[in-house]
Curated annotation (Swiss-Prot):
Involved in iron-sulfur cluster biogenesis. Binds a 4Fe-4S cluster, can transfer this cluster to apoproteins, and thereby intervenes in the maturation of Fe/S proteins. Could also act as a scaffold/chaperone for damaged Fe/S proteins. InterPro entries: Fe/S_biogenesis_protein_NfuA (IPR017726), FSCA_dom_sf (IPR034904), HesB-like_dom_sf (IPR035903), NIF_FeS_clus_asmbl_NifU_C (IPR001075). Its cofactor is [4Fe-4S] cluster. It comes from the Bacteria. Binds 1 [4Fe-4S] cluster per subunit. The cluster is presumably bound at the interface of two monomers. Pfam families: NifU. Homodimer. Belongs to the NfuA family. This is Fe/S biogenesis protein NfuA. [4Fe-4S] cluster binds at residues 142, 145. The lineage of its organism: Bacteria, Pseudomonadati, Pseudomonadota, Gammaproteobacteria, Enterobacterales. Keywords: 4Fe-4S, Iron, Iron-sulfur, Metal-binding.
Length: 184
C-alpha cells in the first residue's frame, strides 16, 4: 500500500508536468543489508512497464514498485517537508514485522539451535515486542541449565543483534526448573 499526502501529490504532479507525456514515478527500493531498506524516487517511462512491477494509480500519475519488495514492506508513506526555502520529499517505509519474526525464527532454528542441540536443548522465538526486544523460551537441556543466562547474553543475544541490527536485546521467559534433563 502506498499513501501519498496531498502536498506530495501536488509536488510530484508539478515535477511530472515538466516531463514528456507518459512519464510516471518509480520507487526504487533496495534491501541494502539485513534490516535497512533504502528508497529513491525515479522517473519511470511507460515503456519500462512489465509484469515485475506493481502499479498504483493516482489521479495525475502512477507509481511503480518492483513486486518482490513487498515481502518486506507493509506500506510506504510519501510526504513533503519544507526546509528553509525548498521542499523535500520524505519517504517512510513500514516493514512487515511478520517477516522479521519469520527471519529471526529461521535464524534461531538453523544457527542457534544447531549449537544448543549438543546439550540436548533448543530455544524458540515467542514474540518480538514493539521496542524491538526478542522474547525467547528455552526447552530440553537448556531449561534449568545453570549456564542459560550466559548462553542467552553472551551467545544468543550477540548473534541475533549482530545479524539483526534493529533488535535491542533478548528476554528469556523460561520458568527455569533444574531437572535431570538440564545440561548443568
Amino acid at each position: 500500500m502506498i499513501i501519498i499526502s496531498k502536498s506530495a501529490k501536488h509536488y510530484l504532479s508539478k515535477l511530472l508536468s515538466k516531463k514528456k507525456k507518459g512519464t510516471n514515478i518509480k520507487l526504487s527500493i533496495e534491501n541494502k543489508d539485513k534490516e535497512n531498506l533504502t528508497c529513491q524516487i525515479k522517473y519511470f517511462d511507460k515503456k519500462e512497464e512489465n509484469f515485475n512491477y506493481t502499479k498504483f494509480n493516482f489521479i495525475d500519475f502512477k507509481v511503480y514498485v518492483k513486486k518482490n519488495i513487498f515481502i518486506y514492506i507493509k506500506k510506504i508513506k510519501i510526504d513533503i517537508e519544507s526546509k528553509s526555502l525548498k521542499d523535500e520529499i520524505i519517504i517512510k517505509i513500514f516493514k512487515k514485522r511478520e517477516n522479521l519474526k519469520n527471519r529471526i525464527s529461521n535464524f534461531i532454528k538453523y544457527k542457534i539451535n544447531s549449537k544448543l542441540e549438543y546439550h540436548g536443548g533448543f530455544v524458540e522465538l515467542i514474540d518480538i515486542k514493539e521496542n524491538m526486544f526478542v522474547i525467547l523460551k528455552f526447552f530440553g537441556g537448556c531449561n534449568g541449565c545453570s549456564m542459560a543466562k550466559v548462553t542467552l547474553k553472551e551467545g544468543i543475544e550477540k548473534e541475533i543483534k549482530k545479524n539483526f541490527p534493529n533488535i535491542k536485546g533478548v528476554i528469556d521467559i523460561t520458568d527455569h526448573i533444574h531437572s535431570e534433563s538440564s545440561f548443568y
